[in-house]
Amino acid sequence: MNYLAGDIRAQLPARFNQQQKAREELAWCAANAEKAPNRGYLREVYYQQAKLAQAANEPEKAQEYLRLSGYRDLNRPLAFNTAFAEDTATGHTFVPRRISEPVPGRVYALSGFEFTEYYFVVSDDGRELIGIDAGTRPDSAKGAYEALRAYAPGVPALTTVFVTHAHWDHVGGFSFLSSLNPRPRFYARSNYEEELTRSLNAPPAFEKNFFGERFDMADVRRFKPDVTVDRPTELRVGGTRVSLIPIPGGETSDGLFIHLPDAGILFAGDFIMPYLGAPFIEEGNFQGLLDTIDIVTRLNPRLLLHGHEPLTRVFTSPVMLAQLKTDLAWLRDQVQTAIRRGDERALIHQANLIPPELLASHPDAQFGYLLLREHVIDRLYDQSIGYWQADLQGVEHLSRADHAESPGRLFRRLGGTTHQSSRTDDGRREV
């Protein structure tokens, strides 16, 4: 309530005399930041404080509030109160930096240090530290590891790292973690090289947008585990029982669950990343996703920890995933029927496909379905058709330069003549 009241009062014209009340409410918000859904809400608080200070002829305060808001000036076109952030050098983060303890004193989750999550587990005997995944870049892995040791100086040395899959953001920090003394032992799925090759051959246009200018594909190329796993494997690390479970999908072909059965914890990696595989490379296994959900429900973990903070927040429990599986199977049937009917992809999206039982299901399953729907349609469509699509995409090969041409010039170059093309009253061209 204070957030909305302060934000609205700060924007009212001066004749309403609400500036002081706005200052008080915004100051309360800044002082009680831990009560906000996420720290992204403070951006608008600081921005409105900056505008109030500027109007009160307090330029130094205005500049400080503006700096805290993250905006460049006092003319921002849109208000952002999201948890995520973008940085040219370090890339995307889903949430502000924080360290939490899903199991106090035993399991540490490091969020917001880069694109992916870091997890560390203190072994049952207290003598070894277990890591889950290696992060995106050596510098971010170093920052996260040092932050953990500053936060919990009594944790033991890192001895073991289990890698859930060989995507860029889960192996790119390998060179830092492998440089520690003593050197940790790395475990991965036996077919990790297949996924690594797929990642290394991906178009380069996207990687730095996600992972920042500091990202270097050479860091991904350096990844080489000490032990590979091709079947369900159980071992003990410092007395902690660990089950390594190869999974059939759905993001990558080399997925590996890290299960701590005695603690009821499952480190799930990115098996249910909404894109169903990175959207800019050919991967993703929808049936594998459904089969992997069955594995989760069979294991029935008390804690389900994913490779990215929003996944942990959204895909929360085996019960929710079981409901989601039913909804996704229905969606696949609808998409496949539409493809056989010859519908173009845009029409399938516009159909607003909603399972009959969705509205009666748990709200968590509703949100999860809506989050996945667009990308499941895209992936299934991509994997079900050839290079000639129903809307004739792929029949003609147009470059960016072609798209930049005027319609008439492009029409003539593709074989049309001037008498074949005419302009209607509303400006459209008809043949």
Mark where each language-model region is.
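Structural signature of alpha-solenoid helical repeat junctions
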Residues: 1-4, 21, 34, 41, ...
